[in-house]
Amino acid sequence: MYRKSALELRDAVVNRELSVTAITEYFYHRIESHDEQIGAFLSLCKERALLRASRIDDKLAKGDPIGLLAGIPIGVKDNIHITGVKTTCASKMLENFVAPFDSTVVRRIEMEDGILLGKLNMDEFAMGSTTRYSAFHPTNNPWDLERVPGGSSGGSAAAVSARFCPIALGSDTGGSIRQPAAFCGVVGFKPSYGAVSRYGLVAFGSSLDQIGPLTTVVEDVALAMDAFAGRDPKDSTTRDFFKGTFSQALSLEVPKLIGVPRGFLDGLQEDCKENFFEALAVMEREGSRIIDVDLSVLKHAVPVYYIVASAEAATNLARFDGVRYGHRCAQADNMHEMYARSRKEGFGKEVTRRILLGNYVLSAERQNIFYKKGMAVRARLIDAFQAAFERCDVIAMPVCATPAIRDQDVLDPVSLYLQDVYTVAVNLAYLPAISVPSGLSKEGLPLGVQFIGERGSDQQICQVGYSFQEHSQIKQLYPKAVNGLFDGGIE
């Protein structure tokens, strides 16, 4: 059953080949048998999920119509609210916080009869790229348990890679869906800013965050987006970008002009560079034309991103003070000491580091030097992408400079920040991007290529990703590090 895509599972439900209860029980058995080694989940909603599965089976038995996601098990990153379920953001600060309402994406998934399995591990408050910054436990890469799965949506990527669920929700602030997707050999889609509601997502960077799906195949990205994309009155940043469905769009003619910023590829590990150019060759054989585009301004993307993201994080996380929300210290002599102790005890080192950086760049003495200049460069970066899209339909870039790194190779914070060089610009410019598996490194680790489009061209980007998937002959990648999970290799 784990070899079936979400779309295939739904077809099996519709055709009465499988019951929703049987599917749900099967995937819980996989999680309970193997997740101890991987650590993808923080909590499970088993009783809730099986009750919903039974109700959907009853609907089928009565001949009632069922939703788009009927019978599909879905994991949810633990910064997205499900009513009555803990939302910890993988932080001691929110260790006991129970969500009082559903996020819009969760509400729409359940309206379409999706089955929510549980909450997935992440870097604390989505700040990190290894899932080693979780306050509770690390998540391991199913391809090599001594390597990181990426982050911050590392639990989501690992869960899909291990086939604990065919779809997982992640959030992408600077690459947090696409980078772990590439590290774990799955598909990751970062929608345009405003394409998916952020209502019920715990905010990190409010002008950067987007919720998106991680899946095994591009068709399931389209299915998920059809279920939960679109305007939401509870999120004023959402827009109606799309005509028709994502699933229908996959069969339309693929854009043929692909831009590549070749001057921005020098930092790639050699086998990653070879793999990227092999991916371009696949698209050329399919009929695309590859041209060079000038995106030299991208060299400023990482520092600008960490200025903007840290400033927004410092503002958003100010609410976690031990009074209104979050952990409160056991003893303090006065209110100011209570604030300080509660935040010191509740936040981990990486979150603290970014709050300090954000407060620094927003301080009266430094705001003009850092934050305002950073926003000016962000505007230049947006202009550079717009100029590039006047010459091409889609931009292709690597996702990561290297395959997944080992625990002992986890770098100092600044070096880890520089790993985001190929992903953060997409968020700064509000663009959609999809990461699709592109093969294996010389060490047998998965690699990914990303396709980037203009804001609102999400369906077109999925078309390109689907075309690459079909022509690359890499339909699904199966990891082999966990005994009994599956055989390993490419299918």
Swiss-Prot record:
Domain of life from the UniProt record: Bacteria
PROSITE patterns with a match to the protein in the record: AMIDASES (PS00571)
GO cellular component: glutamyl-tRNA(Gln) amidotransferase complex
EC number: 6.3.5.7
Catalysed reaction equations from the record: L-glutamyl-tRNA(Gln) + L-glutamine + ATP + H2O = L-glutaminyl-tRNA(Gln) + L-glutamate + ADP + phosphate + H(+)
Keyword Membrane: no
Example GO molecular function: ATP binding
A Pfam short name: Amidase
Keyword field: ATP-binding, Ligase, Nucleotide-binding, Protein biosynthesis
Gene3D superfamilies: Amidase signature (AS) domain
GO biological process: translation
Active-site residues, as the UniProt record annotates them: 77 (charge relay system), 152 (charge relay system), 176 (acyl-ester intermediate)
Root EC class: ligase
Keyword Lipid biosynthesis: no
Subunit structure, as described in the record: Heterotrimer of A, B and C subunits.
Stated family: Belongs to the amidase family. GatA subfamily.
Functional summary from the UniProt entry: Allows the formation of correctly charged Gln-tRNA(Gln) through the transamidation of misacylated Glu-tRNA(Gln) in organisms which lack glutaminyl-tRNA synthetase. The reaction takes place in the presence of glutamine and ATP through an activated gamma-phospho-Glu-tRNA(Gln).
The protein's name: Glutamyl-tRNA(Gln) amidotransferase subunit A
